[in-house]
Design a protein with these regions (language model features):
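Class I SAM-dependent methyltransferase SAM-binding "motif I" and its flanking Rossmann-like core
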Residues: 94-161, 203-206
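Short hydrophobic/aromatic-enriched beta-strand-loop microsegments
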Residues: 56-62, 112-116, 132-138, 184-193
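Class I S-adenosyl-L-methionine
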Residues: 3-22, 27-118, 213, 223
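Short gly/pro/ser/thr-enriched loop/turn and capping motifs at secondary-structure boundaries
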Residues: 46-48, 65-67, 122-126, 149, ...
Length: 248
């Protein structure tokens, strides 16, 4: 049930922290972080972004194997919204792209708490590569490598997408690559992994899809994985891979 009127005080801002580089924050995100009395932040938020806020910082990130349950995050948001004029809920990338932002918005609205979404630069764009390119890739799709409860995604809808971006798929890269090959993607299709995009620790790894399927590629999370001909043109031919970094 909605909270009593008198219990409501604060507004919750669901803010995208971008892929890492603090200079990729929106002006609104920067302003809110500078003024926020409390910031509830996720695991993948860059420490340089957190350093911008003088307010209280509450970690609510989800580590593999152990995590704050989403319900507990909801309770914390309600508690802080009651206690402060406003609250920043800070998520890596964009809060509405694989960030469970929609769940938090619905929960807060159901409980009578006003919410505003402040978009961030999604990590889908953090490679600096074009996901679409005239005459080469007329569309793209993004898929999570891990579903709720640790399930595996159905990759059939993505078999023929010109550019495919995989998030949270590093630990399952061999399975994903094998499944995409089984579904008909080109074994020699170029792919690019970008570890810790837009940060000083960024690392890029180029590999054919079949090489990934054979377990020949060493990558550490968090990493973005891009598959498609845009990788061949922009990362192999026309520009050095390192020249395409986004921020840093």
């Amino acid at each position: 049930p909605p909270l009593p009127e008198e219990a409501m005080r604060g507004k919750v801002y669901l803010v995208g922290a971008g892929p890492g580089d603090p200079e990729l924050l929106t002006l609104k995100a920067y302003s809110l972080l500078k003024e926020a009395p409390v910031v509830l932040y996720d695991r993948l938020v860059d420490e340089r972004v957190l350093a911008l806020t003088p307010g209280e910082k509450v970690y609510v990130g989800k580590e593999e194997g152990e995590s704050e349950k989403q319900e507990e995050i909801h309770r914390l948001l309600l508690r802080h919204a009651r206690a402060h004029p406003f609250v920043v809920r800070l998520k890596g990338g964009d809060p509405m792209v694989f960030g469970r932002g929609g769940e938090e918005v619905l929960f807060l609205l159901r409980h009578g708490v006003p919410v505003e979404v402040v978009p961030g630069v999604t990590s889908l764009l953090a490679s600096g590569l074009p996901l679409t390119h005239r005459g080469l890739a007329h569309g793209f799709a993004a898929v999570s490598g891990v579903l709720e409860g640790g399930g595996y995604p159905d990759l059939r809808p993505f078999a023929r997408v010109p550019t495919l971006v995989v998030l949270m798929g590093v630990g399952r890269r061999v399975w994903i690559a094998k499944e995409l090959l089984r579904l008909g993607r080109n074994p020699r299709e170029p792919t690019l992994f970008v570890e810790r995009a837009s940060t000083p620790k960024e690392r890029r790894v180029l590999a054919a899809l079949e090489e990934v399927a054979e377990g020949k590629v060493e990558v550490r999370p968090p990493a973005l994985w891009i598959l498609g001909e845009v990788v061949r043109v922009f990362a192999e031919k026309e520009a050095p891979v390192d020249a395409l970094a986004l921020g840093g």
